[in-house]
Amino acid sequence: GCCQNLAGAHHTLAEFHQVMERLVRMEDSQYSYRNTLLATNSEGITAGIIVSYDGAQLKALRKRFIEEAKETFGIDYTGMDPETQEGELYIDSLAVPAAFRGKGIAKMLLKAVIEKGWEMGLPAVGLLVDKGNPKAERLYADMGFEYVNDAVWGGHSMKHLQYPLR
């Protein structure tokens, strides 16, 4: 998948996960714990996560990923296409483990990010959905996300969707 593509042919998914763990611990990374909402069950087990940030901040937030990728994988992602832009609270990642799917957790996390977008005064919440994931696309459409344009990210054909806040 896209994680292996980002790590490159000579590196493992385990190495990629180590990079991501370092980025999560940083304050100024797009994957920072500060940009992450976590859903847990009554036993404190992670039932889902969503990562979002102001699209206008992508370039500054991505610096840490670029540094880590250069150092760990020897790959320079400086020229990587932006996946978001100014004017949207961008949902970078949404994940719900298989055991917790179908319980409304993704909807709850999406609603929380939509609320965050309102509080920030941004005009929209945006995301990219893989064209090969109709289930996710249906979830977003059911919640009010609208098609904006086609995009390619990480070698995958994507659709850029937005939830209008104005």
Where are these regions (language model features)?
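Conserved GNAT-fold acetyl-CoA-binding loop/helix
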Residues: 1-24, 70-71
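Active-site rim helix/loop that mediates acceptor-substrate recognition in acyltransferases
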Residues: 13-36, 41-42
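Conserved beta-strand in the GNAT
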Residues: 38, 45-54, 90, 95
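A short, internal acetyl-CoA/4′-phosphopantetheine-binding micro-motif in the GNAT/acyltransferase core
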Residues: 40, 68-70, 74-75, 94-101, ...
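Conserved acyl-donor/pantetheine-binding loop and adjacent beta-alpha core of acyl/acetyltransferases
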Residues: 54-89, 93
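Conserved GNAT acetyl-CoA-binding A-motif
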Residues: 87-89, 101, 117-128
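Conserved acetyl-CoA-binding loop-helix of GNAT-fold acetyltransferases
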Residues: 96, 102-115, 119, 138-142
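C-terminal "cap" of GNAT-fold acetyltransferases
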Residues: 123-137, 142-144, 149-166
